[in-house]
Amino acid sequence: MIKKPTSNVARLRKHKRVRKKVFGTPERPRLNVYRSLTNIYAQVIDDTVGRTLVSASSLEKEIKSKLGYCGNKQAAREVGKLVAQRALANGIKRVVFDRGGYIYHGRVKELAEGAREAGLEF
């Protein structure tokens, strides 16, 4: 019997492949995206020291109270704007975008566009 790997296993394989090439430095850290069925998370990571510099998610009170349901594109755009504002406040202007093995479409694309709107460059 042939067993088809789940989409998450395939995503993790893609993510490992991408992580070999995408590396966050202190000058240009990595903007990592993780999406679940009901929420979306973003982190700005410096891989040289393995430290998260800034993070934002749709679970935060300011986003959840404004939107209610947070598993949609509108919430992803708000998370992108929030993580960009926090990064700019910490002096981070340029990042490397790590889509986490997800295709650049839907919520991942909206998060990236929201971050660009707020002034983050990648």
Curated annotation (Swiss-Prot):
This is Large ribosomal subunit protein uL18. It holds the Pfam family Ribosomal_L18p. One of its GO terms (molecular function) is structural constituent of ribosome. This is one of the proteins that bind and probably mediate the attachment of the 5S RNA into the large ribosomal subunit, where it forms part of the central protuberance. GO terms for biological process: translation. Keywords: Ribonucleoprotein, Ribosomal protein, RNA-binding, rRNA-binding. SUPFAM superfamilies: Translational machinery components. Part of the 50S ribosomal subunit; part of the 5S rRNA/L5/L18/L25 subcomplex. Contacts the 5S and 23S rRNAs. The gene is rplR.
